[in-house]
Amino acid sequence: MTTTTTMQPFEYNANPARVIFGPGTLKQLPAELARLHVSAPLLLSTPQQLAQAEALQSLLLSSSSSSSSSEKPITPAGIFAEATMHTPTSVTERALEVVRTSRADAVVSVGGGSTIGLGKALAVRTGLPHVCVPTTYAGSEMTPILGETSEEDGGKKTKMTRSDPKILPGTVIYDVELTMTLPAGLSATSGVNAIAHAGMLLFEEREREKSIFRTPVSPC
């Protein structure tokens, strides 16, 4: 007797290949970039978090001066501190020009969803490695989703969202000390955002399980 088994196809995309978590883990950024054979990363931030990007730049420069002669020094290609909410494509285009002229070989985003979104937009367009250093609880660094805003003639803005495994950052460094200086209001809103992401993921997992197992499998 021949039986027919209907299987529900699905796709699964893994989270970032590498996650580093703990207090003081930001100090591991130079080693992570060296592991990726990066020597000229472009640092991304919002205007409000320029000081944090400058601190990263100092960290990388000091690590290069203390590295052995056999190691390739890491010299940041520069800082692009124009990241803003909803990832406007006009900002992305300006950042792309900086990537090209500076010959950056990676992007490092430090901040929340706005900066990480810009890093995603650059990485998916260029294929460059993207290392995230989150400073909020938004969770954008753990999703392969990119939301962008384009402005058409007449000032009309259009929000576009897409999903692609190439959008997912390759390395995420969670230094819990970076969240300690967040204002209480921002901590609360980004925390709620993280809970919302977790709830959506839980619902998605349950729906995936139901789609896989709702059809009985007949023995051959």
Task: State each model region's role.
Residues G24-L26, G113-T115, E141:
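Gly/Ser/Thr-rich beta-alpha loop segments that engage phosphate groups in nucleotides
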Residues L29, A51, G117-L118, L182:
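Glycine/Thr-rich phosphate-binding loops of Rossmann-like dinucleotide-binding domains
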Residues V98-L122, T126-Y137:
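A short, small-residue-rich loop immediately preceding and capping a beta-strand
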Residues A53-A55, L118-K120, E141-T143:
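Short glycine-/acidic-enriched loop or helix-start segments at secondary-structure transitions
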Residues A17, K27, V124-P219:
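A glycine/threonine-rich phosphate-anchoring loop and its flanking beta-alpha core
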Residues T2-D105:
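ATP/NTP phosphate-donor binding region
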